[in-house]
């Protein structure tokens, strides 16, 4: 069974890590992909590797609603429908609240929460009209448990889970046939830790990430959720290294 083939999938944060690995796997399974990220040069390289016929790209900063809307419009204009949106873009600067890193707080809120909301708001009219769709939001194990030094990041990921569950209930009530999935990774080997400016926190996180799993593990979970029959919905995954205790 391959329910991924020919589905039109939009992915934010597609230029590296989980996003890029998801592109690789879904393209192997025949999906048509629309990729958004701030680094257009990286997207162009991915497009060349995967193939122009099945991949469209759009420079996208998820903190800007107009750019998110343009990404969704590109998907519809190029392929005529939108089957899946994967809200993957995210940031994880870490610090204790007393450090008062307000710029980093705002960055996390803008990308991790508002970016997800902008994606949902942009794609819902298309999915409602076609009476089908699937929205996959990347949360985190930090959306299930709070760590010292991670209060704001955890807050953003708890918010992603709450928003996605609210969306699931609202779409079930109206019978739109729109599926939702929350995917909560643990330590994954990506660029996510590069944004940590606090030296003490960076050292602790780097220690945790010594046993990080590869991003293709998350890509496989995404592929699984999309591949499920339309009448069933995989609502939530937690995927972390076997050795990760938290």
From Swiss-Prot:
Substrate binds at residue 140. Its EC number is 1.-.-.-. NADP(+) binds at residues 10-34. Pfam families: adh_short. Keywords: Oxidoreductase. The keyword Oxidoreductase applies. One of its GO terms (molecular function) is oxidoreductase activity. InterPro entries: NAD(P)-bd_dom_sf, Sc_DH/Rdtase_CS, SDR_fam. The active site is at 153 (proton acceptor). Belongs to the short-chain dehydrogenases/reductases (SDR) family. PANTHER family: DEHYDROGENASE/REDUCTASE SDR FAMILY MEMBER 11 (PTHR43115), DEHYDROGENASE_REDUCTASE SDR FAMILY MEMBER 11 (PTHR43115:SF4). This is Uncharacterized oxidoreductase SSP1627. The lineage of its organism: Bacteria, Bacillati, Bacillota, Bacilli, Bacillales.
């Amino acid at each position: 069974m391959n329910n991924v083939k020919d589905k039109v999938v939009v992915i934010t944060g597609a230029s590296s890590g989980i996003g890029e690995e998801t592109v690789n796997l879904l393209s192997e399974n025949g999906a048509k992909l629309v990729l958004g990220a701030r680094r257009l040069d990286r997207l162009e390289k991915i497009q060349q590797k995967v193939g122009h016929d099945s991949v469209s790209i759009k420079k996208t900063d998820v903190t800007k609603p107009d750019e998110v809307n343009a990404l969704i419009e590109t998907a519809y204009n190029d392929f005529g429908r939108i089957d899946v949106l994967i809200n993957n873009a995210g940031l994880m600067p870490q610090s204790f609240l007393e450090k008062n890193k307000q710029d980093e707080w705002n960055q996390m809120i803008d990308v991790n929460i508002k970016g997800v909301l902008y994606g949902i708001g942009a794609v819902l009219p298309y999915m409602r009209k076609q009476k089908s769709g699937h929205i996959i939001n990347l949360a985190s194990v930090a959306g299930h448990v709070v760590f010292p030094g991670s209060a704001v990041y955890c807050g953003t990921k708890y918010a992603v889970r709450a928003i996605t569950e609210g969306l699931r209930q609202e779409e079930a009530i109206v019978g739109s046939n729109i599926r939702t999935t929350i995917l909560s990774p643990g330590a994954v080997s990506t660029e996510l830790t590069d944004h940590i400016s606090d030296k003490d926190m960076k050292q602790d996180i780097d220690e945790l990430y010594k046993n990080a799993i590869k991003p293709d593990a998350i890509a496989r979970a995404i592929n699984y959720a999309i591949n499920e029959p339309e009448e069933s919905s995989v609502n939530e995954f937690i995927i972390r290294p076997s050795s990760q205790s938290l």
